[in-house]
Amino acid sequence: MRNSNVVLAVVVTFNRLDELKVCVAALKSQSYESLNILVVNNGSTDGTKEWLTQQSNVIVINQENLGGAGGFYTGMKYMYDNGYEWLVMMDDDGIPDKNEIKNLIQSYDKVVSAVGKEVILNALVADKDDKDYTAFLWARGSKRTNKILELQKERFFDDIHPFNGTLVKRSVIDKIGMIKKEMFIWGDEKEYMARAVHNGIGLYTIPAAIHYHPKEKGKKGNIIPFVSKYQILVK
């Protein structure tokens, strides 16, 4: 296929049918038209498989529960084997803003030109219940903030919260390979981003691209800038 404009959005799901319905509806409403949707169903037992059989314009892969890592590996492999140029990854409890994918794609070449290297881009993860604030507290220099408008003063910045609206280009996969499926549900996104940084690939958030997510997932602690953290991991 190798259509440079087509994006494959991959959603990994396990027993969260209500959230999945909202996520898929948001993807179907994206302003970016050259978009295909793939749902990787990790052995759900809550009616997800049956609901997916009724959906039009959604590619479905049903598999045993291989965790988030196994789900995203399956999605990434499908993207690569079927010739897509772009991949956007998200969990089933996230909701992409209607312009999320368009803003990520339109930002890609601009960021590459500004930083002089290949990149992985991420949407800004907003609190789905209070859309003026992010789902995670951000460290910007000596300041900490969760205010969307304050963060949107920058065109992009170099921290990310991966697999919440994460854009990966085919050339990045050529360079660093696939997600490690054996990691199941722990650390797969961190390991993949560490591998990216170790191979000279930048990680940047695009504040104009918004991905809504439950705030409680961000209560584990304040954000640590991913670049510094990953440099420690890959030594």
Predicted features, each with a name:
Residues 25-34:
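Short, acidic, metal-binding catalytic loop of nucleotide-sugar glycosyltransferases
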Residues 26, 41-50, 94-95:
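A conserved acidic beta->alpha catalytic loop
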Residues 53-78:
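Conserved donor nucleotide-binding strand/loop of the catalytic core
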Residues 84-93:
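Short beta-strand-to-loop acidic/aromatic patch adjacent to the donor-nucleotide binding site
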Residues 99-135:
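Conserved donor NDP-sugar-binding/catalytic core segment of glycosyltransferases
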Residues 149-168:
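A recurrent flexible, glycine/aromatic-enriched loop bordering the glycosyltransferase active site
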Residues 166, 172-177, 182-209:
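A short, conserved alpha-helix in the catalytic core of glycosyltransferases
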Residues 194, 202-235:
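Active-site-adjacent helix/loop segment of glycosyltransferases
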